[in-house]
Amino acid sequence: MKIDQNNARILGVMSGSSLDGIDLALCHFRREGEGWAFQVEAATTVPYDAAMRERLLRATEANGLELARLHRDIGIAIGTACRDLLQGQSADLIASHGHTIFHQPDEGLTLQVG
C-alpha cells in the first residue's frame, strides 16, 4: 500500500504516564503550497478500567510472563480503540508507540508495551 504524500488520514494513538486511558486522534493532513494543513476528524480518550490501570502502575515490578501478557492485552485494547474510533472507515496510517513502562534515556533504556 502506498500513501498519498499530499493527502492522508492518520490516526495517532498514545498512552501516557497519567494512566487515564488510550488517547486517539484521527486527522486529515493535506499539503497546501509549501506547508501542511490538517483537520481533526475525531478525537477521544478510552479510559482504562481499574484492573488495567493497576497492571500498568505495577508493570515495573512485573516478571517476564506478566510483561508479555500486559503487552498483548494493551495491544488488543489499542487495536479495539482504533477499530471503534474508525467505525468501518479507513486510515492511511496508524501511528502508535504503545504505553511507556519506563524511560531512562541517560542509560539508553526505554520499554513500551502494546
Q: Over which residues does each language-model region extend?
A:
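Short acidic/glycine-rich loops and adjacent helix/strand connectors
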Residues: 1-114
